[in-house]
């Protein structure tokens, strides 16, 4: 739909996907490989599709196309590998006001978070934001500063304090118990 320059040789291509926005960051310089990928897959519901289709993007990221309504997915869903499903579920409910649909399945706005048990912590604390792979989730908020402060007060790890991205947005990052990056975005065109 459109492209934003993020600085440092990074451009972000944004595509509308129903009620969600898929953001693809393109870096001028090579990015390091992430040690692990706690964001295991992106699932996208498509009307008229009869059966799930598992695909990979050019970087090897798992993208699964599913029929609309498959496992409750009517837009997008993200499969997260977590060390403790109950702990992660509690985090997303308490910190980000997600609602539990069923054990390990959370509604976040109109999207779903699918929590899978992993054998160990999936993202080391030092995992960089700028690396290859599915790197972060973005939640649109009305007040970035208030959302960031609320998340910290509820127990989230602060990863990057709120900053302005020109006149486009004000963003901040927190991390979940498994080190997954979560962007809190107060986008001028949305708020």
Which residue ranges define each predicted feature?
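Short, basic/aromatic recognition patches
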Residues: 157-163
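Short amphipathic alpha-helices in soluble, non-transmembrane regions
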Residues: 94-95, 150-155
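Vicinal oxygen chelate
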Residues: 11-22, 27-56, 74-84, 125-152, ...
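Acetyl-CoA-dependent GNAT
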Residues: 28-29, 67-69, 117-120, 187
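Core segments of cupin and vicinal oxygen chelate
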Residues: 1-22, 79-118
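Short, structured interface segments
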Residues: 52-70, 182
């Amino acid at each position: 739909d459109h492209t934003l320059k993020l600085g440092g040789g990074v451009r972000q291509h944004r595509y509308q996907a129903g009620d969600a926005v898929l953001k693809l960051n393109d870096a001028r310089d090579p990015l390091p490989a992430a040690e692990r990928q706690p964001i295991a897959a992106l699932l996208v519901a498509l009307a008229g599709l009869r059966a799930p289709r598992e695909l990979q993007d050019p970087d090897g990221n798992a993208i699964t196309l599913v029929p609309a309504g498959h496992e409750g997915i009517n837009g997008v869903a993200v499969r997260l590998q977590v060390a403790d499903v109950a702990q992660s579920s509690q985090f997303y409910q308490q910190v980000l006001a997600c609602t539990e649909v069923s054990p390990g399945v959370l509604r976040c706005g109109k999207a779903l978070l699918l929590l899978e048990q992993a054998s160990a912590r999936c993202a080391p604390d030092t995992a960089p934001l700028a690396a290859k792979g599915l790197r972060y989730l973005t939640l649109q908020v009305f007040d970035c500063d208030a959302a960031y402060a609320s998340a910290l007060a509820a127990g989230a790890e602060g990863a990057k304090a709120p900053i302005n991205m020109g006149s486009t947005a004000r963003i901040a990052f927190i991390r979940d118990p498994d080190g997954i990056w979560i962007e809190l975005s107060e986008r001028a065109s949305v708020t």
